[in-house]
Amino acid sequence: SVGDDRQVIIETLSRELRTNDIVIVTGGLGPTKDDIIKAALAHLPGTDTYRTDERQLKIVHDILSSRGLDILDINLAQASVPDTCEVIPNRLGTAPIMVFRFDEEKFGHPATLYSLPGVPFEALGALPDIISDIKSHFPISDIFHKTIMTYGIAESALAKMIEEWEDNLPSDMHLAY
């Protein structure tokens, strides 16, 4: 959890993006002045410019109209997103789901940040889209598990015995013992 301090948010997210390929944050996307995460996210890529996401704008209109609520400028501002993000429409609420992709120049490796609404059912509702996006951008090879039972030999002796074989395994294959 990070407080509502723009600089602390920027520093925390920068630190996390330097050490992780994927960072997922929730909250701070609402229409009120204390919701400052969007401004911090806009700053990360080095730009503070915004655009209106027309799909999210329509969702804002549809949700508020269906509830019989007045559509205020403050509500419409929720469809305003940093220029550098991709938007996954949030069909469950008015706050957009934003995706920021950074090349290795920015944080030393490619990194992706997902910003989800803080309303729990909206964040949970976004997970299928987020997981699909992660799978398409971060292909994961199959995980194969094989259990081999040994007895009568210490772990260190076994490690020494198979050391040369283990050192020659493909780079994406690892042993755990």
Q: PLM ranges: what are they?
A:
Residues 7-14, 79, 160:
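Short, contiguous clusters of charged residues that form electrostatic/catalytic patches at enzyme active sites
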Residues 106, 111-177:
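An accessory alpha-helical subdomain
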Residues 2, 12-15, 19, 25-27:
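Helix-rich terminal scaffold detector
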Residues 7, 95, 156:
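A short acidic, often aromatic-flanked loop/helix-cap motif at beta-alpha or helix-coil junctions
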Residues 18, 35-138:
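Proline/glycine-rich low-complexity loops and linkers
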Residues 1-7:
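Short beta->alpha junction loops
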Residues 20-23, 48, 172:
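Secondary-structure boundary/capping positions in well-ordered alpha/beta enzyme cores
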Residues 25-33, 117:
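Glycine-rich beta-strand-to-loop/alpha-helix junction loops that act as flexible
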